[in-house]
Amino acid sequence: MGVAAKIGHNRWIASLADEEPALQIETADVSLIGHREENQDRVAIAAAEQAVLLLVIDGMGGHADGARAAETALSTMLEAFWQTPHPIFDPMTFLHLALGKAHEEVVKLGSALSPEARPRATCAVCLVQDSAAYWAHVGDSRVYQLRQSQVLERTRDHSHVEVLLREGLITEAEVHGHPMRNYVECCLGGDAALPEMTISSRHKLKAGDVLLLCTDGLWANLKDQDLGRFAQSQAKPLRDSLNDLGKRAVEASAPYSDNTSAAALRWKAA
């Protein structure tokens, strides 16, 4: 069983009580309130000996109790990780079941609060084990795989503008400033019995690869070149580089910046 330590009201780091991860990795997280009254994002990194789980959850500020939705989803998925033997036998099924359970618990939260309450959240999650990464997302929280200075992979948002992009009606550059950028098509805690979720297959990791999970408060205010420079900057700790990246995103959208959160992992070797 793992132990979790809360290092901020919305950030968690968890590990086995008497073991250090055998994986050669460097991890970091950041969560900034931006120019909002409350930080409704939640971030967690859970490190077992043979597997690591990264989580970034964005409580939807336009809905009641977004912070509680994010907290509920995070604790549910952390519990699923610690209750599953590592390395996880079927990563894709694990991610599907964990997200489904998180959705169920957020729906239950809304029912317990009041008939009118509909707490919701978007989510990005990544499991790292056996020299590979498996990820999943719901909504517009993203996962990036960065190699050297390039974006090798990124998740595709469940959002209206992503549909427009896929259909060729707008360009990638137009996504960031589009007036409907914040309209998500699905989320944890929504009306569907099970939200649409995208679950990746196995992504092989090479030394130096960086996995970045982030809320829209970060990616919407940075360019791919910014993320590439972040991945390539190995002269200082990943923690410092990620903090700098978060601050840059907040400054880029001041004085209207959103909550801005991310978790990152640099793969060194098995």
Language-model features, listed with the residues they occupy:
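PP2C/PPM-type serine/threonine phosphatase catalytic domain
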Residues: 1-270
